[in-house]
């Protein structure tokens, strides 16, 4: 139905994602399979290029927020999902390390520093997780847990995520992350959602839909308030970007398991259509 209406569609499937593959192939879409040791990668560190032309026509040209600051804010959420017990000291060390990592690539809070060629609108090459790992290794103290966690992305089973984004973009995209388990599933699901949301915000005049299966992974007890707030924000404001957000879950108890169901209730309240199957 979305295809007939030429609505760009993104499907995030943390469980049984393979069920979408045949349909995706028949529609000449992009089926992205994430797995330990696999090939597909979304660079967690990438600051993605925005197309603000439609926004400028609608709203005029205003002062832009620092893209680096926004990205670092998102990376704090990513790492909080991997290390739920991260201390305030580790959080501050991570913040400093992230700024230093981007500085090594010439990227600062000045958005102009993102461009390799301003005239052509091309962005600079972005750092990857091993760059952050190397910066943390050089810091004197307080980085042990951060380095141990990052080691798996640099030298371990998730080293496939230590590279530039290599996904073919299309009008119909399926992200299968069913081979990922534990805290890595929640963190990668957040990374995929961030990537999709950035794509969805590129052009407010273009219709699009974000479909998130098993959304409790991001708003339930396995997640945290930071990630859940971002998910809720998407459901609140996606219409302002010409989009729709669709969530699915098999167990409403999981849906309401974080902070007394605050985020699950918020999503339901922002959904015009609710379908309950028994």
Predicted segments — roles?
Residues 1:
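Glycine-rich phosphate-binding P-loop
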Residues 16-22, 255-266:
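Short, glycine/polar-rich helix-capping loops at beta-to-alpha or helix-loop-helix junctions
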Residues 16, 247-252, 278:
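A short beta-strand-to-loop transition that corresponds to the Sensor-1 phosphate-sensing loop
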Residues 28-33, 261-276:
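A short helix-turn-beta junction within AAA+ P-loop NTPase domains corresponding to the substrate/partner-engaging
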Residues 6-21, 35-36:
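Short beta-strand-centered segment that lines the nucleotide-binding/catalytic pocket of NTP-utilizing
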Residues 21-30, 36-38, 44-243, 259-261:
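P-loop NTPase motor domains
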Residues 12-13, 211, 248:
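Generic enzyme active-site microenvironment
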């Amino acid at each position: 139905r979305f295809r007939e209406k030429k609505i760009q569609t993104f499907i995030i499937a943390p469980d049984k994602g393979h069920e979408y593959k045949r349909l995706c192939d028949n529609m000449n879409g992009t089926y992205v399979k994430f797995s330990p040791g696999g090939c597909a990668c979304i660079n967690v560190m990438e600051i993605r290029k925005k197309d603000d032309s439609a926004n400028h026509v609608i709203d005029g040209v205003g002062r832009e927020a620092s893209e680096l600051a926004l990205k670092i804010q998102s990376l704090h959420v990513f790492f909080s999902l991997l290390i739920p017990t991260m201390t305030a000291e580790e959080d501050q060390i991570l913040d400093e390390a992230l700024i230093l990592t981007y500085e090594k690539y010439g990227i600062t809070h000045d958005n102009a520093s993102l461009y390799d060629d301003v005239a052509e609108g091309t962005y600079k090459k972005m750092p990857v997780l091993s760059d952050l790992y190397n910066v943390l290794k050089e810091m004197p103290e307080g980085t042990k847990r951060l380095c141990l966690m990052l080691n798996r992305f640099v030298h371990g089973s998730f080293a496939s995520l230590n590279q530039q984004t290599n996904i073919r973009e299309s009008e119909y995209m399926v992200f299968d992350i069913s081979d990922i388990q534990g805290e890595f599933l929640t963190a990668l699901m957040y990374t995929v959602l961030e990537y999709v949301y950035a794509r969805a915000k590129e052009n407010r005049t273009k219709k699009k839909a974000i479909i998130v299966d098993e959304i409790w992974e991001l708003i339930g007890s396995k997640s945290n308030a930071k990630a859940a707030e971002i998910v809720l924000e998407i459901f609140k404001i996606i219409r302002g970007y010409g989009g729709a957000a669709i969530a699915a879950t098999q167990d409403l108890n999981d849906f309401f398991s974080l902070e007394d169901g605050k985020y699950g209730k918020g999503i339901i309240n922002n959904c015009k259509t609710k379908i309950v199957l028994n």
